[in-house]
Amino acid sequence: MVEAKNIIVVIPVYNCHRYLSDAVTSVLNQPCKGIQIILVDDGSIDGSSELCDTLSAQHETISVIHQKNSGVSAARNAGIEYALSLCQGQEEASYLAFLDADDAWTSNFFDASVLDAMMQGYDLIGFLSCGCNISMTKRNEPTLLQEGIYTGGSSSIWIHASQPFCAMLYSCKLLSTYHLRFQTDLHYTEDKLFSMSALYLAHRILLQNKLMYLYRQNAASAMHTRCHGIPYFAPIIHGYLMVDKNMAPFQNSQREELVAGRQLACIYVMDMADEHFSHFGTLKAFNRFMQENVDSEELSALLNGEDSRIPANAAYQQLQQHPVAYVMKAYLKGVLLAFPRLCVKISLVKTLRDARRFPIAMNESTMEE
């Protein structure tokens, strides 16, 4: 039987003193009492470390791990290891969730219906998430899932495109059996690679249109989140190529070979090209990446359609055939985007953009409409 103690939440903490109490309170206030919380302080220097200890002293269900600053992936991995030690011998009945320190759960989420779902023994249970403004007084409309029961494997990988990593419950048995952990050498999309691996390895997956997760979005910075060019995209592309290789040993009659990582790597190469050129990067720098990158030969073959399962990338072929025209078009796009990028920094524009982006008012004290 699933009990509250079989639910474990890992919260990585790094310089998030302003929001940490809200995140923890959103778990403590759930109808299901006794949920175990693991706070992993990743070398915070803003008072978050001390706050973790204070919260732990106040609530017996809260444990704290202090470590030197090693990144969010290492913090989550430390939380996973500790969580598995807590549920040793009860992995089949235990579930792990992840909550970022500046986000929150909706109130009344962990009710009897969620506990009933957990008792069915699913490897993964996915729910809804939505973005909120900084004060968490307004939110947007979540994208609905195709509710139902799914079998893991390559056909289920694309669930991750609309299923945020944090709005899922992960069976501790799944994490333990396959030693699922986060890649510590990645600073972006490490959560996507983790969820892709989990979806591939899971046997049974349940998706429900029940709102679980609220994440803060800074509308002013949204237009700049991918404005990092080649240094930003290179590790992401490498990570997606690696996930296919990492899952290859688990291929069997029930799991087809995973190619989603390679497909996504191709998409991200062209996203990288668009970001690079629209911010007036040079063709020479892009070509250097394609020639000198550790994955260059594999990427070129994939983009040119040499793998029959992955169609040739039309945009890449256009770039190869008409490089000057492609780059000039991207430069023009960059010029057209320059004005909106400046405007979004204006306070009034931020307010108007927030109002449009987060139309649904919430009760701040209960995290509900």
Regions found by a protein language model. Name each.
Residues 41-51, 70-71:
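A conserved acidic beta->alpha catalytic loop
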Residues 101-208, 213-231, 267:
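Donor-binding/catalytic cores of nucleotide-activated saccharide
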Residues 15-29:
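Short, well-formed alpha-helical segments that are part of the catalytic scaffolds
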Residues 67-89:
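Glycine-rich, basic loop-to-helix element that forms the pyrophosphate-binding segment
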Residues 277-369:
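Membrane-interface aromatic/basic loop that binds lipid-linked glycans or pyrophosphate carriers
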Residues 96:
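Short aromatic/hydrophobic "clamp" motif used to bind/position activated sugar donors
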Residues 34-43, 63-68, 101:
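Short beta-strand/loop segment that forms part of the nucleotide-sugar
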Residues 212-218, 225-255, 268-298:
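Catalytic core of nucleotide-sugar-dependent glycosyltransferases
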